[in-house]
């Protein structure tokens, strides 16, 4: 199993469908920087009640170097990329397209919310994908219906 750094978008997507626990089931350990914590705790995040937020506190890990990437990506994403390098993580869990492309250009292996859910499905940790995808669509998460339906068809589930 591997270590992962998690960005806000992935935590929001998993929290929305009550699947934060998948992080502990798929990865040896996971962490996120203080900027991600600030984003989660300071803004309205459906799916994140106090209990879920409190359970995540033990995964906060501050960065120790200057955040030189905040000029080219959001603060939480930039701290996540920096933390990835500082603790020599195996994966960066991130959804934002631009930030993901920058991270990949730095040689970082990225997985998004969809990838985590698909890993969980393959391991038998998730029975059905369609209820998860429906919630994401209803909540305006940044996934296209076309792509989600292609995934559902691949796993022999009805499109949404």
Question: Each predicted region: which residue ranges?
Answer:
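Active-site-proximal, substrate-binding regions of enzyme catalytic domains
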Residues: 2-89, 97-100, 106-108, 131, ...
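Generic anion/oxyanion-binding catalytic loop in active/binding sites
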Residues: 12, 118, 137
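Short beta-strand and adjacent tight-turn residues that come in two discontinuous sequence segments
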Residues: 94
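Long, charged alpha-helical interface segments
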Residues: 122-160
